[in-house]
């Protein structure tokens, strides 16, 4: 019988990254996955602190948040239609034995899936997905293309500009913060700080 440690290792961050890389050649999609991972992982740290988890439980929670974020769009490059994404990917994850919590969160991040967001990781993924993409776009229009120059006020101003980053659903950003039970400006600032701390990992 496989031990819990061995099983966890089989579905850890390294394995998630390998699967993402196998299915996704686009560097921008890989960077998006990493940006979402950074934001969702920061939410995971805050949740672990709130729950006062011991080291073992904390590690498990953070692994779940990181892997869920990395894999949320792993099938998008091959299956970008609403009929296929994220359903094809989730079926593959089920075949490979990835945890139910991860698969449910990935289904839930797509509004059209009909899967409700119940757990904190479900809500964190939805709240960070579109926002991470928007924050990246805000950084890339800066002369230095550095997220260090992006501030909350500037992000809110850009959100009102419908011509900017048209692909980002502003309503999802607003709804995501509401579902997490946090103020929108606070959530934007929280994700900005997380991305600024690890900017080198995503080329910003």
Region locations from a protein language model:
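Divalent metal-dependent phosphate-bond-processing catalytic cores, especially two-metal-ion Mg2+/Mn2+ enzymes
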Residues: 25-30, 36-57, 71, 122-204
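Residue-identity detector for glutamine
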Residues: 15-18, 111, 175
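Acidic/His-rich, divalent-metal-binding segments that scaffold phosphate/diphosphate chemistry
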Residues: 1-82
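Divalent metal-dependent catalytic cores for phosphoryl transfer on phosphate-bearing substrates
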Residues: 58-162
């Amino acid at each position: 019988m496989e031990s819990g440690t061995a099983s966890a290792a089989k579905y850890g961050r390294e394995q998630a990254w390998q699967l993402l890389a196998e299915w996704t050649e686009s560097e921008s999609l890989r960077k998006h996955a990493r940006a979402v991972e950074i934001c969702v992982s920061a939410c995971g740290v805050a949740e672990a602190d709130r729950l006062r988890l011991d080291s073992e439980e904390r590690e498990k929670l953070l692994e779940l948040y990181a892997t869920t974020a990395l894999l949320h769009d792993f099938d998008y490059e091959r299956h970008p239609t609403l009929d296929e994404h994220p359903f094809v990917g989730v079926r593959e994850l089920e075949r490979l034995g990835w945890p139910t919590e991860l698969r449910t969160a990935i289904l839930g991040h797509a509004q059209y899936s009909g899967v409700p967001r119940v757990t904190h990781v479900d809500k964190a993924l939805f709240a960070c997905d579109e926002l991470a993409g928007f924050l990246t776009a805000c950084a890339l229009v800066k002369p230095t293309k550095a997220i260090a120059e992006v501030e909350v006020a500037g992000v809110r101003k850009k959100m009102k500009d419908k011509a900017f980053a048209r692909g980002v659903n502003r309503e999802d950003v607003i709804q995501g913060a509401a579902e997490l039970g946090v103020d929108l400006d606070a959530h934007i600032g929280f994700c900005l700080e997380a991305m600024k701390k690890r900017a080198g990992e995503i080329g910003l």
